[in-house]
């Protein structure tokens, strides 16, 4: 009988295979057991009810329980994760034990803010996991080199329907990197439609997805400062290093999903609060949400919680140009315009100017050339030729600073706005009859209010109403109820001409030919210009139509065409508006409506003002005097 000996190499392979078969089930069993223990521990701690878990997934209470504001169904790990915090928590823990594959982002990285929180809460042993997403997160963190976050506020841009309230986004301050060379984090609507009324309407109803994007900061400044000509304000967020880390994790996690973007409430101003609240959960910033979330009110809220440092002002190209223009006389301005439009040679620069004056003139010219190019008034070829000529001439001047080097910081700053909501009570006399009234405004700003945080002498009001009681007649009447009342009065300038407009829509009392008033649908629109005639007095002129619609009128309408002229003077806590208007019906020669009106405002406090008015008006060959005063409370 022959004894056969086994080959040693074959014996070794069989032994390894045997050991592998024994070890793998044990490892899988060990993982499953650990995974089960974590889920059990999370349930014992009721983590799915924890306020922080609800915050991380953007859950808000609904009629049936909870519902996340995140609208991307693929972002949730549980099939019913959008409405089931418990199922989403369990699915999240399960996902941490998924094997790493090349074509799928591992959940420990994709959900890095959840990962950090659950590791701390459950004391997760990362060695028991197939993959640690913090390895990838550390690379992103090293690339961005986050030192701190800044909140950036480009001021309101009244001539764009979607920018009337301004905007908010984040700036990442990196080590040894100037702000303009840094990165920004923007949350906004992803839309292919150009800014327009249709764009605004679709945005109101959430027709666009909203996403976080990481963009170079200089591109943001180019857009807001040079193209839109909006001043920007930077506020450093008062957060620790660990809080900055938490905030960055949440932003990265949210970059994998989207929400339906609503211009009025679920907008940039509201959605950027989630990363800040993730860093500072004690603030509960997202719990209160009004029908409209305004950037200036968010700044006010963050300031109240001590989250914002001092404001850093970054003037727009428009502000820089207007400041430089203030140091130029008429002949210098005329020369610059001709030079930039190719009607004058740079060698013909006005004589007798100091080096500082020449430097200021040439710096203004370089800015104006940029504006002309962006406004498509000159071609790229014309711009390059003239811009190089201007820069060459400027470099020949030895002085480093021009006359307008220092640009003063505006006294009106966004962090100190009045409350957006307003209630008022007042009394007065109207055509010999005493009255008392009460007013309400849902939001935001009247041109007679303090300007802090809003465009000076502008107006943007939503849902305002005034109820009056006439003492002699013993009758209540709704004087008006406006859905929207907007007045834009940018200052007209010969270099950068801007046009104003007004729009008012709602219901209002309207005088009929029989001498009685009736409530009718009201639509008023006009266009015009505005300019400063004194340092503190702004004049304006509008021309347009004032229309009323009711079944009591011939052809169901009362159409008036005409115009209005006015002067607004601001001096500290006092503001005055004097105006006159005249409108004529094209169908009735006796239907000529005119009014001369004076309004005064004394600001008693940031959120309290005393207002008064006097009016002399007439229509259908009848005239009347009215006067009154009111106390307005903003909150």
Task: Enumerate the predicted regions with their spans.
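Residue-level signature of outer-membrane beta-barrel architecture
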Residues: 429, 442-444, 485-487, 527-533, ...
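Active-site nucleophile-His-acid catalytic modules used for acyl/amide transfer and hydrolysis
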Residues: 217-293, 547-550, 614, 619
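Long, charge-rich alpha-helical interaction segments
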Residues: 297-386
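Repeated loop/turn-to-beta-strand initiation elements of outer-membrane beta-barrel proteins
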Residues: 446-453, 488-496, 532-540, 570-578, ...
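Outer-membrane beta-barrel "beta-signal"
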Residues: 440, 623-635
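N-terminal accessory segments that precede or flank the first globular/catalytic domain
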Residues: 31-204, 351-488, 507, 526, ...
């Amino acid at each position: 009988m022959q004894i056969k000996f086994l080959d040693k190499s074959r014996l070794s392979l069989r032994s390894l295979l045997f050991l592998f078969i024994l070890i793998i089930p044990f490892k899988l069993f060990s993982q499953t057991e650990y995974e089960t223990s974590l889920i059990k521990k999370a349930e014992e701690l009721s983590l799915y009810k924890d306020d922080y878990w609800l915050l991380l997934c953007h859950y808000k209470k609904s009629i049936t329980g909870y519902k996340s504001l995140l609208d991307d169904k693929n972002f949730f790990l549980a099939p019913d994760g959008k409405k089931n915090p418990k199922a989403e928590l369990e699915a999240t823990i399960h996902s941490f034990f998924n094997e790493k594959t090349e074509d799928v982002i591992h959940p420990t990285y994709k959900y890095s803010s959840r990962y950090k929180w659950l590791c701390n809460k459950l004391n997760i042993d990362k060695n028991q996991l197939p993959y640690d997403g913090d390895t990838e997160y550390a690379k992103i963190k090293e690339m961005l080199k986050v030192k701190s976050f800044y909140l950036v506020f480009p001021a309101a841009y009244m001539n764009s329907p979607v920018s009337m309230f301004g905007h908010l986004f984040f700036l990442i301050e990196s080590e040894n990197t100037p702000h303009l060379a840094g990165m920004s984090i923007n949350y906004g609507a992803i839309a292919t439609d150009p800014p327009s009324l249709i764009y605004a309407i679709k945005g109101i109803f959430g027709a666009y997805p909203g996403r976080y994007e990481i963009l170079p900061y200089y591109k943001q400044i180019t857009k807001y400062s040079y193209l839109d000509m909006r001043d920007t304000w930077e506020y450093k967020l008062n957060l620790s290093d660990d809080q900055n880390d938490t905030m960055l994790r949440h932003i990265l996690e949210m970059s994998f999903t989207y929400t339906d973007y609503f211009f009025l409430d679920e907008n940039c101003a509201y959605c950027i609060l989630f990363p800040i609240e993730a860093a500072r959960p004690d603030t509960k910033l997202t719990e209160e949400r009004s029908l409209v979330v305004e950037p200036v009110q968010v700044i006010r809220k963050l300031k109240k919680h001590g989250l914002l440092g001092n404001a850093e002002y970054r003037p727009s190209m428009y502000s820089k140009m207007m400041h430089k223009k203030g140091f130029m006389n008429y002949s210098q301005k005329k020369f610059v315009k001709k030079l930039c439009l190719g009607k004058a040679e740079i060698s013909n620069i006005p004589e007798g100017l100091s080096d500082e004056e020449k430097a200021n003139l040439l710096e203004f010219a370089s800015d104006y050339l940029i504006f002309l190019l962006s406004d498509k008034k000159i071609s790229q070829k014309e711009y390059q030729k003239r811009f190089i000529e201007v820069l060459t001439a400027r470099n020949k001047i030895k002085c480093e600073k021009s006359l307008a080097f220092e640009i003063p910081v505006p006294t009106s700053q966004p962090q100190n706005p009045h409350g957006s909501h307003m209630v008022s009570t007042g009394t007065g006399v109207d055509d010999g009859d005493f009255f008392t009234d009460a007013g309400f405004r849902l939001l935001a700003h009247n041109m007679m209010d303090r300007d802090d945080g809003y465009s000076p002498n502008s107006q943007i009001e939503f849902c305002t109403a005034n109820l009056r009681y006439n003492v002699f007649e013993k009758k209540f009447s709704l004087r008006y109820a406006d859905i929207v009342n907007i007045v834009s009065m940018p200052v007209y300038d010969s270099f950068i001409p801007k046009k104003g407009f007004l729009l008012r829509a709602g219901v209002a009392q309207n005088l009929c030919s029989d001498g009685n008033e009736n409530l009718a649908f009201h639509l008023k629109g006009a266009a015009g210009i505005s300019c400063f005639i004194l340092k503190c007095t702004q004049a304006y002129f509008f021309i347009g139509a004032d229309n009323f619609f009711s079944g009591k009128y011939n052809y169901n309408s009362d159409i008036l065409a005409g115009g209005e002229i006015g002067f607004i003077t601001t001096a500290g806590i006092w503001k005055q508006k004097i105006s006159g208007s005249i409108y004529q019906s094209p169908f009735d020669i006796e239907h000529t409506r005119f009014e001369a009106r004076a309004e005064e405002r004394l600001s008693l406090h940031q959120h309290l003002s005393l207002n008064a008015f006097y009016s002399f008006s007439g229509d259908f060959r009848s005239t009347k005097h009215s006067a009154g005063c009111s106390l307005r409370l903003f909150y």
